[in-house]
């Protein structure tokens, strides 16, 4: 059986509705939210989205639940805040 949604991917379910640019944006978001991410605790590629902003590691012996972004585990704001906190800690230690 051939792949019928080569160009549109997961947004093939919308057909011709809603416009191409909106479907392109939705495709990017849906691919991010349905993919697996690396667990920061066990290092395995087993973190999946359970609800908006809630991520769970299904690794053997890990089963940690994380709070993150709605579509990805980490957001740009969280990464920025984490690096700022790390930099401030280094300044205090020195």
Curated annotation (Swiss-Prot):
<dbReference type="GO" id="GO:0022625">
    <property type="term" value="C:cytosolic large ribosomal subunit"/>
</dbReference>
<keyword id="KW-0863">Zinc-finger</keyword>
<keyword id="KW-0687">Ribonucleoprotein</keyword>
<dbReference type="InterPro" id="IPR011332">
    <property type="entry name" value="Ribosomal_zn-bd"/>
</dbReference>
<comment type="subunit">
    <text>Component of the large ribosomal subunit (LSU). Mature yeast ribosomes consist of a small (40S) and a large (60S) subunit. The 40S small subunit contains 1 molecule of ribosomal RNA (18S rRNA) and at least 33 different proteins. The large 60S subunit contains 3 rRNA molecules (25S, 5.8S and 5S rRNA) and at least 46 different proteins.</text>
</comment>
<dbReference type="GO" id="GO:0005829">
    <property type="term" value="C:cytosol"/>
</dbReference>
<keyword id="KW-0479">Metal-binding</keyword>
<protein>
    <recommendedName>
        <fullName>Large ribosomal subunit protein eL43B</fullName>
    </recommendedName>
</protein>
<comment type="similarity">
    <text>Belongs to the eukaryotic ribosomal protein eL43 family.</text>
</comment>
<keyword id="KW-0963">Cytoplasm</keyword>
<dbReference type="GO" id="GO:0002181">
    <property type="term" value="P:cytoplasmic translation"/>
</dbReference>
<dbReference type="GO" id="GO:0003735">
    <property type="term" value="F:structural constituent of ribosome"/>
</dbReference>
<dbReference type="InterPro" id="IPR011331">
    <property type="entry name" value="Ribosomal_eL37/eL43"/>
</dbReference>
<dbReference type="Pfam" id="PF01780">
    <property type="entry name" value="Ribosomal_L37ae"/>
</dbReference>
<dbReference type="InterPro" id="IPR002674">
    <property type="entry name" value="Ribosomal_eL43"/>
</dbReference>
<keyword id="KW-0862">Zinc</keyword>
<dbReference type="InterPro" id="IPR050522">
    <property type="entry name" value="Ribosomal_protein_eL43"/>
</dbReference>
<keyword id="KW-0689">Ribosomal protein</keyword>
<dbReference type="GO" id="GO:0008270">
    <property type="term" value="F:zinc ion binding"/>
</dbReference>
<feature type="zinc finger region" description="C4-type">
    <location>
        <begin position="39"/>
        <end position="62"/>
    </location>
</feature>
<comment type="function">
    <text>Component of the ribosome, a large ribonucleoprotein complex responsible for the synthesis of proteins in the cell. The small ribosomal subunit (SSU) binds messenger RNAs (mRNAs) and translates the encoded message by selecting cognate aminoacyl-transfer RNA (tRNA) molecules. The large subunit (LSU) contains the ribosomal catalytic site termed the peptidyl transferase center (PTC), which catalyzes the formation of peptide bonds, thereby polymerizing the amino acids delivered by tRNAs into a polypeptide chain.</text>
</comment>
